[in-house]
Amino acid sequence: MIHGLHLTIAELAVVVGSIVLVLARWLPPATRGRAAAGASVVTLAGAAGTLPDPRWQILMVLVADLLIGAATGAAWLLGRRRARREDGPGEQRGGDLRGDGQSEQRGDGPGDLPGDLRGDLRGDGQSEQRGDGSGGRGTRRRDGRGVRARWWVALPGSLLCAALVLGGGVAAWALPVPTFPEPSGPSPVGTTVLQWTDQSRDEPATRDDADRRTVVVQLWYPAQGAGAERAQYLGRTRREADVVAGAVAGYLGAPGFLLDGPTRAYTHAVTGAAPAEGRFPVVIFSPGLGGVRTQNTAWAEDLVSRGYVVAGVDHPYDSAAVVLDDGRTVKTRIAATGDRAEGERLRTAWTAVRAADLRFVLTQLGRLDSGEIAGPFAGRLDTARAAATGHSIGGAAAMQAAADDSRFTAAINMDGGLNPGQGPLRQPVLALTHEVRDKADAEFVTKVDTVLGAGGATSYRLSVPGSAHLTFTDAPLYLPPVPALVGSLGGSGSVRMTEATTAAFLDATLSGRAVDLRAKLAEYGTLSVHDH
């Protein structure tokens, strides 16, 4: 992938070659044929390099090429037909009357080549005119491609093809296949996906009394060595990634193909790699409403490289789509009601469900560490040093889980709204909030400060200039760089900010490393500290 352009070399060849093909119609006759021929070779070679699975943006460009090819072929055929008509049957009869069986040929070129092709071959770019006394009036000039349409006929087609080529190129840049930044720590990263059922809880989203709450968890962990095959993003397989991306797009009201890029991405983790020796602090992550367990993969992998285990949680019937071990896909049942009071009630209810999910996952990680659940993680997971973390409603759920369960020794809220009425927090908290731009943002920050101020440990709120709600996720790596959508920090800048601030906080609170936390956080924005 070419940095900055978000195109592979093959894709760039398709786009550049197609631009030249569009422009070739308007070049001087002496260069038109050579430019079109060269561009055709480049485009075909690039197209072959995108097979067998070209991105939809490149398909747009190739449609333009097909239109150009069809128009060129039609012009050539029309030129041949016109040449035959202008040769006329009379000359054939003249040859027959001479008795030599030969038909008379016009011009100086071979066979029935259009006159201006002969001109092009001579290099003078001139079209040969038939001597019928018309002076060419009412005719179209013909070149080496046959009949050349008048400019006002060709212009709309050229503009359409140009729009397809440029539109495809811009779309490929704006909606790229994400490239994940290299983790900053020394440890290789492994990953695996687990599914657990909490037999003590009913599934609140169904009416089946026998249905129990099930969660899907992706673990990222320090591994013994780097592997050759990197893990698929958004799912265990490409098919699962396609399902999840389509569901996320549908939840946002967008067509699924717009999120084609993330389904093609691979991360730095290696699926099933052997865990490294040692015991590592645990970080449990809850995604945003309609989000999925992998939405903060870049952040998770960076923390793991620094010596943490991260567990990303899918919440069935809340996450956009959760693919279960039996192949079933559970999609979200949460939708906007238009009623503010009802919306707040649902938000509170699902925050509680998510908080219970996080507590259950912490319990299961403890069972993995003890060997009660068989697997390679026995003795690796230090659940006595555990942080509840999340984004958006996941951040609120993390705060609720920490308030409800003292086993969590720290908490991180990434731009999640908090209810001042929730229970007090006894753990240190880091709250990352987007830039304050209006009254609603100011009210949002005030509620967060109220909760942090009521806690029992020193907590921090960092307002990050240039950030938006999705800045704290992987979204800046694959969504258009629209500040209102993903902020203005850039893809890698957004990821590095989230990694640096949260890692400093976890180093200070879970790992006991010497960190000037206040100074480190203040590097990235406006810091408010709630001392206790």
Regions found by a protein language model. Name each.
Residues 5-10, 31-82:
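Membrane-embedded alpha-helical segments of integral membrane proteins
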Residues 222-224, 233-258, 294-340, 465:
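Active-site machinery of serine-nucleophile hydrolases
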Residues 170-283, 491, 502-504:
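Domain-level recognition of soluble alpha/beta enzyme cores
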Residues 317, 323-380:
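Alpha/beta-hydrolase active-site loop
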Residues 143-176:
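Internal/C-terminal transmembrane anchor helices
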Residues 361-425:
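Primarily recognizes the serine-hydrolase "nucleophile elbow" in alpha/beta-hydrolase
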Residues 433-495:
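Active-site-adjacent alpha-helix of alpha/beta-hydrolase-fold enzymes
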Residues 264-280, 285-323, 438-441:
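Short substrate-entry loop that stabilizes the transition state in hydrolases
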